[in-house]
Amino acid sequence: MDEATRETISYYDENAKRFVADTAGARMGELQSKFASMLPTGGRILDLGCGSGRDSLAFLKAGFKVDAMDGSAAMCRAAHALTSLPVAHATFEDYEPQGPYDGIWACSSLLHVPSAKLPAIIGKYAGALKSGGAFYLSFKYGTFEGMRHGRWFTNMDEELLRSLVAHVEGLRLNEIEVTADVRPGRAGEIWANAWSEFESDVRSYS
């Protein structure tokens, strides 16, 4: 495990209660509904970096089957307490997805991965999708990369997102949506959302 990942996980382990409280009121319904509309009824979802389990719970209530994982043991416990799901404790690099999935939801999670590692990690998970499966990713908007307040952040703008997805074999970018933060009092913060899908016959450039 690299130092950036270790420090980021330690941050969440030490601040889990505060993080859960800060994100519980996030109004994610619109993004969740958009993602759900891309999936078959009752389909399988991987909540990649599930955090508090807030989104996993919403998808369970909507009738989907959900696998959840997170790198922080404290966040895994919080997600299990909220959802009753068996939440896998593993890093993005170590976790072995139990696909095939109809969709992968990576909300505000892969932004903690250094950019040099992102194509390989995203490619690993894209390969666990069914053909036509949806892959949602969100990042803080911008070009900053590095440690900030105890966590690693890899921010993305439109150009960086297009380049990232283009370097993942089989993944096709359908839309980039720039949105305001949905947490109470955080509307001034901006997010870049990538809506993509996996097609086994798509080939990206290297």
Residue ranges and their predicted role:
Residues M1-T41:
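Conserved class I S-adenosyl-L-methionine
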Residues V182-S206:
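Core SAM-dependent methyltransferase catalytic element
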Residues G132-F139:
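Conserved beta-strand signature within the Rossmann-like core of class I S-adenosyl-L-methionine
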Residues G170-V182:
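Conserved S-adenosyl-L-methionine
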Residues L46, S52-D94:
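Class I SAM-dependent methyltransferase SAM/SAH-binding core
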Residues E93-I104:
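A short acidic, Gly/Pro-enriched loop at the edge of an enzyme's catalytic core
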Residues P119-S131:
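A short glycine-rich, Lys/Arg-flanked "PGG" loop and its adjoining helix->strand segment in the class I
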Residues E145-L160, R183-G185:
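Acceptor-substrate binding/catalytic loop of class I
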